[in-house]
């Protein structure tokens, strides 16, 4: 059976890895998932990400999870726009996540950016997900 929403699967693997206090999680590789992982590294939510291969030889992304004082840095990671219901917002309508403490991942014509950067650039786009 094929995977319907690979980004939601990535978020779920990260959530499950944090719940199980894993150091690393592995996700099947795609360019958009690698962009999201790099975004999470730049925002400080995960330690690192790198392209690797599974034991079967399939490309994957190895994500090193981040903890602070034994607690996961990511409290919440949630998919917003999904294949069956895409959510687009203009720069004026972009939501503030956790009152500004979290970030919305926005896919714009300028690439993947945070809600703050999208507002600064004056561009809207598809809301991929929320992280806090």
UniProtKB/Swiss-Prot annotation:
It comes from the Bacteria. Keywords: Ribonucleoprotein, Ribosomal protein, RNA-binding, rRNA-binding. InterPro entries: Ribosomal_uS8 (IPR000630), Ribosomal_uS8_CS (IPR047863), Ribosomal_uS8_sf (IPR035987). PROSITE patterns: RIBOSOMAL_S8 (PS00053). GO terms for molecular function: rRNA binding; structural constituent of ribosome. Part of the 30S ribosomal subunit. Contacts proteins S5 and S12. NCBIfam families: PRK00136.1 (NF001109). Belongs to the universal ribosomal protein uS8 family. One of the primary rRNA binding proteins, it binds directly to 16S rRNA central domain where it helps coordinate assembly of the platform of the 30S subunit. This is Small ribosomal subunit protein uS8.
